Amino acid sequence: MRDASLRDFTAESESASAEAASDDASAGAMAPLPGCAPMSSQLRAARNAPANSQASAAARTPASSQLCIRLASADDADGIRAVYAPFVDTPVTFEEEVPSREAYRERIVRICEKYPCLVAEEGGRIVGFAYAHELRERIAFQWNAELSVYLAPAAQGRGAGSRLYTALLEILRLTGIKAVYGVVTSPNPASERLHHSFGFALMGVQPHAGFTCGAWHDVAWYVREIAPFEDAPAPPALFPAYASAHPDQVSEVIARANESLHL
């Protein structure tokens, strides 16, 4: 990918987001966004929070009756789990049992200690989420991240998935991640369209990657470079630390996601 400015990258992501959700967009002025107000104050407050609670302090916004994207925290684990649970009965995820509430909360805590996790919320109920997580554990892989996105039926076809992905990609780029990966059970036409619309390239297909739901399933690997590869790259920042140090930038990304969601 070319060495684009944040503005260039944002324009590219928003263009892809509009393409992925063109049927969801409507003309006219942006509607007010109750509950989706700028989060600069919450993010600034996170500066003085302990490291394991910075993301939580940065995440909270009042509940909204409109579809709204915001940062997640461990307190959202039950709502995120409710969206995720139905997918366990499908080949979309290779997990075959729904994790307990305690185990799933621990999972969200671990994710939020390093990476951004976003939720789509409507009327105080979580209807979708997206997050980044470690691709491989060896230190030399630290500039890569794997992405996941899940939507409840109530949020599907409304542009929530593409807006979650747009915001997630922008935040990851800000923290210093260079390449992102989508690992998709094949076939999955909706996810395949989403990744193609965001400029991901099909890196390869892993045949018979897993046996679940009574059958063998292939897995398609998608990749997108989101930042240049310098000869001496700085290590990527942990998201809570970045959000604490740069609250306005993170707040701006979330605000843009909500503005585009309600155009």
Q: Where is each model-derived feature located?
A:
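Conserved acetyl-CoA-binding loop-helix of GNAT-fold acetyltransferases
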Residues: G157-E170, R193-S197
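Helix-loop element at the rim of GNAT/NAT acetyltransferase active sites that forms part
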Residues: A82-V98
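Conserved catalytic-core motifs of GNAT/GCN5-like acyltransferases
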Residues: Y131-E134, Y181-V184, H196, A201-D218, ...
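Conserved beta-strand-loop-alpha-helix junction that forms the acyl-donor binding cleft
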Residues: Q156, G182-E192
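Conserved GNAT acetyl-CoA-binding A-motif
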Residues: L172-V184
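C-terminal "cap" of GNAT-fold acetyltransferases
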Residues: C36, H208-L263
